[in-house]
Amino acid sequence: MFRPSTSLALRSTLRQLASASNQPIPPGSEINAVKRTVATILPPIRLYRRIIRAHRRLDPDMRAVGDNYVKDEFRRHKNIDNPLQIIGFLSSWKMYLDQLEVQQGQPGGFRGQRLDPQLLEKMSDEQIYQIHELMTATQEAYSDKAQAFPPEKQRELAEKAAADAGLSVKKDE
């Protein structure tokens, strides 16, 4: 997954990351959340595994989208050598994990969050395009007009079509 380079600075950074806390950050101000997140960054493989584990509590469709996105992002960033980029990447994913864990503990589960307009202004065109693609994919997964339906919806449609045709459908138990 993530292979640290032989540079001394990166080794010391990874050593500091390995000694970080596992506790999720409670909701609070964004500035304090960033400071606390940086103080509790997890090593890359451990962070990746915790995110994948947290996704298990999502809806199956959201889990599939989230797992694929996380896997792709970690693959894209596995050869980064710049410690600042590594810290930025890991702290952003740690903030996501903390938000996911806090929201999953609340009634109604994970609901997501709107992006900060200031954050959008700082993004490159490629990053904005990636977010737009992710938004489109998730909207299509839950749209009644979409060509591909989530698995539960496909079963419902198949059962309805069979009932309309006068056929009985065997139910799995």
From Swiss-Prot:
Residues 152-162 have a biased composition (Basic and acidic residues). Residues 1-59 form a transit peptide. GO terms for cellular component: mitochondrial intermembrane space; mitochondrial matrix. It is found in: Mitochondrion matrix. It comes from the Eukaryota. The keyword Mitochondrion applies. Interacts with the iron-sulfur protein subunit within the SDH catalytic dimer. Belongs to the complex I LYR family. SDHAF3 subfamily. This is Succinate dehydrogenase assembly factor 3, mitochondrial. It comes from Mycosarcoma maydis (Corn smut fungus).
